[in-house]
Amino acid sequence: MSVVKFLELSAQSPQGYEDAIKQAVERASSTLRGIQSVWVKEFEAVVENDKVTQFRVNVKISFLLEDSAGGTG
């Protein structure tokens, strides 16, 4: 039996939303194994002096929980 867990994260990038999403997944993958998908819940932009300076996303990342024997699934 497979069990999937979700982790909510926020990430931002001056390059754009796609880069912010990639940064969220990259950061999560540094401590999680078995990442299955990323769901972008919200998009937000930081504005300073009438210009967009940061692109921010709130995401839910799904990953498989390992079984007690140490493997996935």
Predicted regions and their residues:
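C-terminal structural segments of small proteins and small subunits
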Residues: 50-73
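Short, well-ordered alpha-helical segments
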Residues: 2-36
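Noncatalytic linker/hinge segments flanking ATPase motor cores
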Residues: 19-21, 47-52
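Flexible glycine-/small-residue-rich
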Residues: 11-13, 42, 59, 63-65
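Short, conserved loop-to-beta-strand elements that form functional interface hotspots
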Residues: 38-47
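Short connector loops at helix/strand junctions that flank enzyme active sites
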Residues: 4, 35-38, 52-58
